[in-house]
Amino acid sequence: PGVLPVPNEEALRLTALTGYLLHCELPGHVEFDRKNYFYPDVAKNYQLTQLAHPSTLHGYVDFEMKGEPMRVRITRAHLEEDVGKSFHFGRQSGVDFNRGGVPLLEIVSEPDITSADMAHAYLNALKDILVYGKISDCDMEKGMVRCDVNISVRPKGSSTLGAKVEIKNMNSFSGVRRALQYETPRQLEAIRNGETIHQETRRWDDVAGITESMRTKEDAHDYRYFPCPDLVPFEPSKEWFEQVQQGVVELPLDRKKRFMDQYQLPDGAAEAVSDTLLTLQTKRIV
């Protein structure tokens, strides 16, 4: 009676295409895992994700910040299922499960971002890649893209990062920048006062301009990951990868550099033309 579930083929294709756009490695063997935890946004108490064998690994995003070339490495871009959306009002909370189970592409970056402005520039560059590559419209107001930020500080001269603090509930890229501009000094001041920074999850209050503690942050072993028994490993063929790769487009920064080389355009003009083409592309997608 009944049938076992199968992965969403279009979600797998878009994840692989994202991997190509972000210069990632694409393994030929992909597995799904169950991430077990007890929290109201997951009614079944586990979330389908990819831990040991994700869809993509080891990429990077190149972008410019105040005319200087920057690069943020990508740890992985993997597929998982979305969870419910939590609402907090007064002393009560609620959960909207309408988006629960919908395929979600999570892009994880390496700790290469060193300032709030760099985080803002990186997010805009990543958004341009995803929009121009026809992965997503990336409309934050419609919940098409969300961002969680992990912040760690370290003493001067030390290469060891401190405890990781995750910040949620940021509804815009400018909100991400404001949250970083608040949280980083908060942690530094706490260390100067002899306090200990604990690994935790905090919530950004955009109206008050502060972060508030939500819960302690779990380590990976606390989730008790194990392979999903219902989903068989995905091992795409060489032809499948070649078909996905046909969807790779010229990235905005590469296009800008080509305009400068091919048409001898100055930096500002090349960027303006590139941005105009990106806007036209976005309108066609919408």
State where each predicted segment sits.
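Basic, nucleic-acid-interacting segments
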Residues: P1-E250, D267
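Long, charged low-complexity interaction segments
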Residues: E250-V273
